[in-house]
Amino acid sequence: MADASGEVAAVPASGAANGFSNGAGATPAQPNNPLSRKLHKILETRLENDKEMLEALKALSAFFVENSLRTRRNLRGDIERRSLAINEEFVNIFKDVKEELESINEDVQAMSSCCQDMTSRLQAAKEQTQDLIVKTTKLQAENQRLEIRAQVVDAFLAKFQLTSDEMSLLRGTRGGPVTEDFFKALGRVKQIHNDVKVLLRTNQQTAGLEIMEQMALLQETAYERLYRWAQSECRALTQESCDVSAVLSQAMEALQDRPVLYKYTLDEFGTARRSTVVRGFIDALTRGGPGGTPRPIEMHSHDPLRYVGDMLAWLHQATASEKEHLEALLKHVTAQGVKENIQEVVGHITEGVCRPLKVRIEQVILAEPGAVLLYKISNLLKFYHHTISGIVGNSAATLLTTIEEMHLLSKKIFFTSLSLHANKLMDKVELPPPDLGPSSALSQTLTLLRDILASHDSSVVPLDARQADFVQVLSCALDPLLQMCTVSASNLGTADMATFMVNSLYMMKTTLALFEFTDRRLEMLQFQIEAHLDTLINEQASYVLTRVGLSYIYNTIQQHRPDQGSLANMPNLDAVALKAAMAQFDRYLSAPDHLLMPQLNSLLSATVKEQIIKQSTELICRAYAEVHAAVMNPDNAYKDPENILHRSPEQVKTLLS
């Protein structure tokens, strides 16, 4: 490249000299001229495709800054000097590299020697420790086996043994508390006791039996501790507001697996609550509530019904509360008979209040506060007997028996009181009053009966029980009244007696009609009223027929026989007598109200009076029809009968309707 550049710079001078000497018409240089070939080569070169040439020219432009003849002539030398300087610099640099490489080579040689020495020593050590390696391998394998066995043992212990903390929880300390963790540990013991049965079906029966025995002992220890703790907790439940803790409920759930301990704990609870209920009942009777509200029940002893009601209401509330406490205590128990257990314990708890309750109710009943109050107390006792038995069933036998005894006693005294009242009525029977209305004894007795039945209707005793009581009450009260009225009216005339009996029976009927379960008695009273009404109807008809002179005529016609001859020839049945009777009968037809018996005005019921008038009028019309038929009969030999009886039966019926 330097040579070519030098020659290129020298070419123009030579060429120019040759050109001037040869002139314009000179022939071109020969192709075999070396210079020509170089020129052609240079001229034909395509610099854009020659990257090396471009790089050389770029390097040349870095130091060839002045294009002159001198610089062109010295270009070759400059290039060579520059090339030499570069080579010297390169040599100096590589000398440093060579020295570094020689140092590295020495280090590598030293390291190689060290490695060879270490390899030799390792080989020697390997040969010397071969036995140790074999032993180590065996020990590692043994260690692995032991680790596996340790894991198995740990798993076995975790499965079939308790931790020290769990053991401490189960054994605990005397009087120490029982917590949730205790029941978890107890559940763990039960689980182990059940799981260990698997070992008994394998070749590990000895271990299984030992573990089972150990768990059984732990269970007994835990149950004994739990029982002592639960017993202590139950003894502490002596407040009126009993708060059963969740832990105590869990304790009862756990103790159900030991029926004897479970029963003893329930008995302890019942004993504690029994004394609390008795104390609370006595306090309610004598001291009242906190701060004097509510007031002591004994302060209402002057009001027998409220006194008995307050005592029974307190007991009802206490019974319901104790049942709720027991339900909270046994809410987690799943064994059979929980309901029966609750009822039995409630019966034991409430048994303590029976004696003070019985004494106080007996005092009230035996004081004989009156038939109405006795009956109300009897119904009240029956209601609470039904209500409390609905809460606790029939297991609270003592309390329910006490209430039932008091109910029967009050009922007995009540009916005794009614019987005494009835005996007094019969011992001194009053004469009917002048107006033939109900006697004062009857009115007083019916007022008493109305009060009794009203209290019975308002009671909350079950329907079937109320109906049975009603029948007995009505029999005890009404039968003596009916007998008294009959005896009282026995010396009266027929119409007076019938009027008095109708009034008395009507008053009884209106009294009973207001109440339920009286339909049968109302029917009986109605039958008796109708019997006496028939008497009054006949008496009223007879009264009218007698007053108008038709009574004798009608009776004679009814008793007449054909062999006696014609009616016209019989005494007092001739045409003159009949016309006189018809004249009076016409006056009756014009004002029938003027011929009413005085007794009818004494009747209490206007409806009954109208019924008597209506039906007696029908009898009169029927009697007139028979008289009319007999007179119109030709066999009776009446002449011109139309002039004797100028009204037909239909006309008479129309006038009287």
From Swiss-Prot:
Cell compartments where the protein resides: Golgi apparatus membrane
Keyword Protein transport belongs to the record: yes
Classification via Pfam families: COG6_C, COG6_N
Membrane association type: Peripheral membrane protein
Chief localisation class: Golgi
SMART domains xref list: COG6
Alphabetical UniProt keywords: Golgi apparatus, Membrane, Protein transport, Transport
Gene Ontology CC annotations of this record: Golgi membrane; Golgi transport complex
GO biological process assignments: glycosylation; intra-Golgi vesicle-mediated transport; protein transport
Function: Required for normal Golgi function.
Quaternary structure (record): Component of the conserved oligomeric Golgi complex which is composed of eight different subunits and is required for normal Golgi morphology and localization.
Homology family: Belongs to the COG6 family.
Protein name: Conserved oligomeric Golgi complex subunit 6
Taxonomic source organism: Mus musculus (Mouse)
Annotated gene: Cog6
